[in-house]
């Protein structure tokens, strides 16, 4: 019998809690990640007031220096710890796949200086369209169409760009490059990025409409992902008849593998929280696992190195945390964590190699305190033990510590 009938995992994308032991092997603009500390530096630089997460025990997590503006709790309402990444990567897919039990020993490729000519030339030859070379670098999806959309409307050239994650994105105005044509180009790009030197996690079609100065991306986005290289705990759950619900980009990250119910993409963190709450309220969701990603921390503030915006985004989530808890049942477990760091005060614009926080809360808890420090995959091992399924590659359950 399950200890908890429902478990809800919420990933606050990029909310790291201090440099990992191997941070010296990961870099931002030539600077090692050894001094990165997403939550710590936001707390110092911008101030951080998150009373609801603090009440669970966020400020009690072991750190060399306590969070400046997040107090410790003498009697927290939950259990907390920090977790270390084993896998060789600090991207979204690697983090999430490890959280679900995999050890990624060959990281995906990222292209901070843009894609090599070999890739661009192949796409040009297949599509019969030129590629705007100036866009070939990590770029904000809205900024890239603002900057190059007018040129695309005149020339029909493709806008190919990337991000901090191992993705290749192609933006196309729907009136200039029909959506079906864009999809075919992206399918081809997927076929040539399945191995080194360009092993990518996703190819993303990014259609948009409108006029210069007023472009908007449409709902015709399509992701061409790769499935995890072996079963995750999501697959183990689905195979055992335990429903799995994906909120936000979780379905894309796992290419639908092990997902029985996709609740759709998030328009924003707030929209994602709305969707999570609707998921919690589903009459048929009496047992199972929900998995939510809230990406605004990372996409809107981490990469843009905006500590004040990041702080406000954390405040927004914390303010809505009581709503999530109010929709939980007594035999529900809430787990709040992250997938990597993205220190908005750090060098460069890339993710940072950090520990991730873990907050565990249930109405049924009679105890509280610290969970032994472990690794990302301990989350999936805990979920697996709770529902009586096998673990994946790695992970040690902390279920027995939750009382």
Curated annotation (Swiss-Prot):
Enzyme class: isomerase
Catalysis: reaction(s): 2-deoxy-alpha-D-ribose 1-phosphate = 2-deoxy-D-ribose 5-phosphate; alpha-D-ribose 1-phosphate = D-ribose 5-phosphate
UniProt binding sites for Mn(2+) 2: 298, 303, 351
Keywords attached to this entry: Cytoplasm, Isomerase, Manganese, Metal-binding
Species, as recorded: Streptococcus pyogenes serotype M1
Lineage top rank: taxon: Bacteria
Encoding gene per record: deoB
Family as reported in the entry's similarity comment: Belongs to the phosphopentomutase family.
GO biological process: 2-deoxyribose 1-phosphate catabolic process; 5-phosphoribose 1-diphosphate biosynthetic process; metabolic compound salvage; nucleotide metabolic process
Family matches, as Pfam families: Metalloenzyme
Cofactor remark from the record: Binds 2 manganese ions.
Cofactor names: Mn(2+)
EC number(s) on file: 5.4.2.7
Binding, Mn(2+) 1: 13, 339-340
A cellular-component GO term for this protein: cytosol
Compartments in which it is found: Cytoplasm
This protein's name: Phosphopentomutase
Pathway: Carbohydrate degradation; 2-deoxy-D-ribose 1-phosphate degradation; D-glyceraldehyde 3-phosphate and acetaldehyde from 2-deoxy-alpha-D-ribose 1-phosphate: step 1/2
General function of this protein: Isomerase that catalyzes the conversion of deoxy-ribose 1-phosphate (dRib-1-P) and ribose 1-phosphate (Rib-1-P) to deoxy-ribose 5-phosphate (dRib-5-P) and ribose 5-phosphate (Rib-5-P), respectively.
Ribosomal protein recorded as keyword: no
Chief site of localization: cytoplasm
GO molecular function, one term: phosphopentomutase activity
């Amino acid at each position: 019998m399950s200890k908890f009938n429902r478990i809800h995992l919420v990933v606050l994308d990029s909310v790291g809690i201090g440099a990992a032991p191997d941070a010296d092997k990961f870099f931002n603009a030539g600077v090692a990640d050894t001094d990165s500390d997403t939550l710590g530096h936001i707390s110092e630089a911008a101030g951080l007031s998150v009373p609801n997460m603090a009440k669970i025990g966020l400020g009690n997590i072991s750190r060399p220096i306590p969070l400046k503006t997040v107090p410790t709790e003498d009697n927290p309402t939950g259990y907390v710890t920090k977790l270390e990444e084993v896998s060789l990567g600090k991207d979204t897919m690697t983090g999430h796949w490890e959280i679900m039990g995999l050890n990624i020993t060959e990281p995906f490729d990222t292209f901070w200086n843009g894609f090599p000519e070999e890739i661009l030339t192949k796409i040009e030859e297949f599509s019969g369209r030129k590629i705007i070379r100036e866009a070939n670098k990590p770029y904000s999806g809205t900024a890239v169409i603002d900057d190059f959309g007018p040129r695309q409307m005149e020339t029909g050239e493709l806008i190919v760009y990337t991000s901090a994650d191992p993705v290749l994105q192609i933006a196309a105005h729907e009136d200039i490059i029909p959506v079906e044509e864009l999809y075919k180009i992206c399918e081809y790009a997927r076929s040539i990025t399945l191995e080194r030197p360009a092993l990518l996690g996703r190819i993303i079609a990014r259609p948009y409409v409108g006029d210069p100065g007023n472009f908007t991306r449409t709902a015709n986005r399509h992701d061409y992902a790769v499935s995890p290289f072996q079963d995750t705990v999501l697959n183990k759950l689905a195979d055992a008849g335990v429903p799995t619900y994906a909120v936000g980009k979780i379905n894309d990250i796992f290419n639908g593998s092990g997902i029985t119910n996709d609740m759709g993409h998030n328009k924003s963190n707030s929209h994602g929280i709305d969707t999570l709450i609707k998921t919690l309220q589903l009459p048929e969701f009496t047992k199972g696992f929900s998995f939510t990603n809230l990406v605004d921390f990372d996409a809107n503030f981490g990469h843009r190195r905006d500590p004040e915006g990041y702080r406000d985004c954390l405040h927004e989530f914390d303010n809505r945390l009581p709503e999530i808890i109010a929709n939980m049942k007594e035999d529900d477990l809430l787990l709040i964590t992250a997938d990597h760091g993205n220190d908005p005060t750090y060098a460069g614009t890339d993710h940072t190699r950090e520990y991730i926080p873990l907050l565990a809360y249930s109405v049924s808890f009679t105890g509280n305190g610290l969970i032994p420090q472990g690794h990302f995959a301990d989350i999936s091992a805990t979920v697996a033990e709770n529902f009586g399924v096998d673990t994946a590659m790695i992970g040690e359950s902390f279920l027995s510590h939750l009382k």
